[in-house]
């Protein structure tokens, strides 16, 4: 392969990596093109993919609020594939899930770790699911801070406060007692989909979609 051919191929791969598929919808008024995520949003499907951070959280919150305004009585489906991330960003999604009127059904595809696992279990009771080869991981919050000793102490106390609150909420959503949650989140705790169901993080493992007859 020549150098020019290699450069061209590398460029094509990079372009494909950022490509969002488009779908065409036919109607009496003609054709309309949607990117695939906007089209799925019409079906009340939201994707939470990648690290949980402020910008992504704002997009997820905005989509949930929009779908509530569209129809407050119809479920929202939140697909999660995330290694976790910011606690404050995740809590903005969590609080919105609890605040809005529609039930939020959560489905883990791939992985739901740390804050991703927390949001997975925060779905409506009976509507929290994993695909069979998904992985779920819970642990205590991570933190790091540099500065004066007093400031380090303040931030350490804040992390401990966040840890206590997350453990309380995990206990509430899973049905586990607080002591069990405290013990099981002390270190990274990986679970299979079936184990996550036994633990109470989810309600069921989906092998096949259940189609309405």
From Swiss-Prot:
Entries under PROSITE patterns matching the protein: CLP_PROTEASE_HIS, CLP_PROTEASE_SER
UniProt-listed GO biological process terms: protein quality control for misfolded or incompletely synthesized proteins
Keyword set, alphabetical order: Cytoplasm, Hydrolase, Protease, Serine protease
Location of the protein in the cell: Cytoplasm
GO CC terms in record: cytoplasm; endopeptidase Clp complex
Gene Ontology terms for molecular function: ATP-dependent peptidase activity; ATPase binding; serine-type endopeptidase activity
Entry EC no(s): 3.4.21.92
Reactions listed under catalytic activity: Hydrolysis of proteins to small peptides in the presence of ATP and magnesium. alpha-casein is the usual test substrate. In the absence of ATP, only oligopeptides shorter than five residues are hydrolyzed (such as succinyl-Leu-Tyr-|-NHMec, and Leu-Tyr-Leu-|-Tyr-Trp, in which cleavage of the -Tyr-|-Leu- and -Tyr-|-Trp bonds also occurs)
Residues the record marks as active site: 114 (nucleophile), 139
Root EC class: hydrolase
Domain of life: Bacteria
Main location: cytoplasm
HAMAP family in UniProt: ClpP (MF_00444)
Assembly and interaction partners: Fourteen ClpP subunits assemble into 2 heptameric rings which stack back to back to give a disk-like structure with a central cavity, resembling the structure of eukaryotic proteasomes.
Family membership: Belongs to the peptidase S14 family.
Job description of the protein: Cleaves peptides in various proteins in a process that requires ATP hydrolysis. Has a chymotrypsin-like activity. Plays a major role in the degradation of misfolded proteins.
Name of this protein: ATP-dependent Clp protease proteolytic subunit
Organism: Pseudomonas putida (strain GB-1)
Organism classification: Bacteria, Pseudomonadati, Pseudomonadota, Gammaproteobacteria, Pseudomonadales
């Amino acid at each position: 392969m020549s150098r020019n051919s290699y450069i061209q191929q590398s460029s094509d791969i990079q372009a494909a990596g950022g490509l969002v598929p488009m779908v065409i919808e036919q109607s009496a008024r003609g054709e309309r093109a949607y990117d695939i995520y906007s089209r799925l949003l019409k079906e009340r499907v939201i994707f939470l993919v990648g690290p949980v951070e402020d910008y992504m959280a704002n997009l997820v919150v905005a989509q949930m609020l929009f779908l509530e305004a569209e129809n407050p009585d119809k479920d929202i489906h939140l697909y999660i594939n995330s290694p976790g991330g910011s606690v404050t960003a995740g809590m903005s999604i969590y609080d919105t899930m609890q605040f809005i009127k529609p039930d939020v059904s959560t489905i883990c595809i791939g992985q739901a770790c740390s804050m991703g696992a927390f949001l997975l279990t925060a779905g409506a009771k009976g509507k929290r699911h994993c695909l069979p080869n998904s992985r779920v991981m819970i642990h205590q919050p991570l933190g790091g801070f540099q500065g004066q000793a007093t400031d380090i102490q303040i931030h350490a106390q804040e992390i401990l406060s966040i840890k206590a609150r997350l453990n309380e909420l995990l206990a509430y959503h899973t049905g586990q007692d607080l002591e069990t949650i405290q013990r099981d989140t002390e270190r990274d705790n990986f679970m299979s989909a079936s184990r996550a169901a036994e633990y109470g993080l989810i309600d069921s493992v989906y092998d096949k979609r259940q189609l309405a007859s």
